[in-house]
Amino acid sequence: VDRRALLATGLAVAALGPGAFAQQPGPPPLKEAPPSPAPYSRLQGGGFVHHLEPAQEAQRVFDSPAPKGPEGRWTTLAPLPLPRSEMAWATAWAGRMHIIGGYGEGRVDRAYHHVYDPGTDLWLDAAPLPRGANHVAVAAHAGRVYAFGGFIEQNRNPDTNAYAYDVATDRWSVIAPLSRPRGAAAAVVLAGRIHLIGGAGAPTAERASVGWHEVYDPQADQWTMRKALPGARDHVGCVAYDGVIHVIGGRFNTFEYNTDLHHVYLAERDTWEARAPMPTTRSGHGLVVYRERLFAMGGEAGILTRGVPQQAKVFGQTESYDPKTDTWQQHAPMPTPRHAVGAAVLGDRIHVAGGGAVLGGALQSAVHEAFTLA
């Protein structure tokens, strides 16, 4: 079986050619995944957590330095089936949100694949990622959800694996691997191709941010190189809008060295240009396109001294960028600050699910909140 072997729940079952997805019979409907019994859980030692401790609550930050815009409002929706963080940043296809991999239930290499249906306010179980990992990069295009790289250990040991999930058949296939291992990269679709930007690579012991910029062609199953991101960084926010790619925020190696940098990639010239920086310097935030603006929410910052958080911040700020005026403004913050969230737009709402409730990976969240402008 070659690298395009079809994977159903992680098992190779048939050889696959470039157009074979459409030939596969459709599976039964995805099964409902019951909601988590508690909003949080611990990575170490296990166990659900119903309330944050005062010291954990103190990490929450809500105030933005940006000028005020329309408030908007947040609502609480069905929680994830279990508390999760450090998963793929989330992507949407056909009106549903897909959240893949990450930390959960005491492990950092989960293969979870949960799908949210806004019409029923239910989470569904989909075929798991063939190999569990955290900080996987994901993007959706032409009926498939693509997953690239990730870490096998806790924010360490990057991977080269790449997979495509066929939404119509609930099955994964192996596609051309990354040329170099990396996790916490950003994946975004532009003109039918998937750009994989930034992230962190080897060595395992001393994780290092990278500015690598590679482009995957789904038709040819091939990778090509493009101009590197200025300022190698990971845990960025990344979206494509109006023919350009925006890369905003992130970190240089660790959350102690976050940045507010904002660059756009101009594909026709294979070059990068600077734009107005993000008002709140952060990494591990969500970034989506909503009503012709770029909305950033969540994230983290701080210092870890021998594993103990110092100056820890978990952000609730919601800020939006107007590409026409190159300006930012603030909106109502997330009620539950989190980082490493899954964020996607479904209909006229921004959905933010899961994420870390405290600095680092100690506490996962099942919280699911949605934002809309009046």
Task: Please annotate each region the language model reported.
Residues A5-Q23:
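N-terminal export signals
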